[in-house]
Structures are given as structure tokens and as C-alpha cells.
């Protein structure tokens, strides 16, 4: 219903970051929901939270994108995009101090990937100096529902590299693994996966929404996490992992949280941080705890695992503490890492892309919507560049090697 039922003043102190206050104390989320088919919107509207959204903020088409990136980006999506931008503009004009935009989308289908990246590039044109953070769900072969996912994902990454400021990389495979292994769920549903994603999103954004001892926002996060502009794809982890509707058995200590959040099993994307090195990382703790203990633990982590952090960026792990824990937990922690091991995911998608593209499989669905093969080639080479950039910085050391010295002589 959009009314606040708690009794904590701090919860309401910055409620206007994500909500507009309407008459009689109702809060309306500043969210725009878009899709190219009406079905999903109908299920949101008839669901438990359907009534809290502003009805005008549902923007949908009738035809669907049929898992086709070109339909989302060039044909169907292009027809709908202006009505979406009108709503976005209206919401942006209501803001006192607009910091940026958050886009949640998947990269495997047609709408989230094609139209999602179209929306991002349009917002980029209109608000060039605002932050653009995305929560992007990458496709994975183990949990696949369309054969053309690698095409859609590669074309999307090509856009995200250029137009997004920070991408939180999520992955259905990793989310399923967490449900199976850690939460011991036998048949996880999308509801369970979304529960994990929402816990992570809540953690990433808690500094924007609540007062805390060490405050950070989207821009500070970007400044601390992105050493090179193209390398803005982050792995996210969360601790403690709980399943929907479960009660937590005992409160974790700060050392346990620190241990868990960096564990590969707690990462929301299917890449193993131990196979690469962290360029930068950030940890956001929530709950009543001593900032001193958090700092000590973080230093401890860096000292014990120094080989997993690049040595040419000193102090590359930042931590922040927010006093208000998530609902149902005493303490929690969200971890965001800019790790070179994320290239495993890009490699995986790229290899599948190349296998199909070499034989030009399924290409007619895209060229039929007016795309050119050239675009596929460009997206593929951009993905290759991204992978080799991650590899280059993974191998980089603080000491200049002989090879560099020769370059200086010539210069």
C-alpha cells in the first residue's frame, strides 16, 4: 500500500531517495517498469506490490521481442522508447538532485538486453553527467532458455562497456548454485533467485538510503572501484545468505561476515575470484558493529590474501558501515569486487558466440530486423578487447619489466 509501518525515524530520514511522498503519507517508488509485452506487467500489477507503483510508470508494448536483441534495440523497442523516456523525464524532473539511474535487466532475452541498452544509451545522451549503474543478469549455459543468448549478451556488453558507469554482474547459474548448495533448496524458483538479487541490491544501495558512519554514494563507489573506465563490471557477494522466509539462527560476527562475503560460493556470478586478482574492492557492512573492528578485519583480509590483490593499487579495499541492518538480520555485509576473474564469464559467452557466429547460425533473425553482420563483428572484437584488458592487468606488476624500458628509449 506504500505506507510506512515501522517506528524508526532513521528509516524515513532519506526515504525520498527512492520514493516520492504522495498525499496522506503514502510513498510511491520512483521506478519505471518497461517491457515489450503486457504479460509481465500484469503479473506485477496483480501481485502483492502491484498497487504501490504509479500506474503511468508501467510502459509496455504488445508484440514482445521474441528473445531477439535487434527487435528490442532497433524495431519494436525503438517504437516504445519515446514513451519510456517521457516517463523517465517526468521522474527526473521531480528530483531535487538527481544522482543517476539504476537499470535492472537481463542480457539473455530481447527486451532487457536490446531495449535495456537502447534506454541506457538514450539516457546517456540526455543526462551525460549522471551516473548509470546497472544490475545485469548474464545468461549461462546451465540455466538457458534460448539458444541465441550468447548473441544477445555479446551485443549488450558491447553497449554496456561504452554507456554504463558501473555494472553489477549477476548470473542465473551462480544464483541457482547458491540456492542448491548453500540454502539447500531442492527446486529453486525465480522468486528465490530474485530474493538473492534483492538482498544484494539492498546492500549495494543501503548507503544511499540510510544515514551511516561512512557514507558512500554511486559516484564515490565508482571513484573507488574503477581504475580504468572500461573495466567497470563488478562481482557482488552477500553474507549471510538466507533463503526466503527463513529466520536467521544466530548472529554472525564481523570476522565471519568478512570470511563469508569473499567466498566464491557467495558470489552472485559464476566466476571464481581465486582465478584472478582484485583491482579494487569495497565492502558495505550493515548493523550495529564497531567501525574499528571492521577496519581491522578488512586489513587482515588484505594481508592474508595479498596475492589476490594487485600490488600496484595500494589501499584498494574500501569499507563502509551503515547502522541499519536488513530486515530480519542483525548484521549483514555486501561485497563488491572489481576482479580480473570476471573475464571467465565474458570468455564463456564469447566462446559460445563465436561458435554460432562462425557458422552464421540464427543470424537471419537479426539481419531481418535491419542489423548488419558488421555489428556482430564489432561486438565480438569489443568483447575480445575487454577480456584481454582484464588479462593484461591481472598479469601487470608494480616493477617495470625490461620490455617497458626499451619503449622509453625509443620514445
UniProtKB/Swiss-Prot annotation:
Q: Which residues bind GTP?
A: 37, 106, 110-112, 172, 194
Cofactor dependence: Mg(2+)
Q: Does the keyword Transport apply?
A: no
Question: Is Cell inner membrane there in the keyword field?
Answer: no
Question: Which GO MF terms are attached to this record?
Answer: GTP binding; GTPase activity; metal ion binding; structural constituent of cytoskeleton
Region: Disordered, residue numbers: 392-411
Q: One Pfam family of this protein, by short name?
A: Tubulin
Q: Which GO terms describe its biological process?
A: microtubule-based process
**Transmembrane annotation, as ranges:** none
Report the CDD domains cross-referenced here: beta_tubulin
**Where is this chain compositionally biased, Acidic residues type?**
402-411
Family assignment from sequence similarity: Belongs to the tubulin family.
PANTHER family this protein is in?
TUBULIN
The protein in question is named Tubulin beta-2 chain
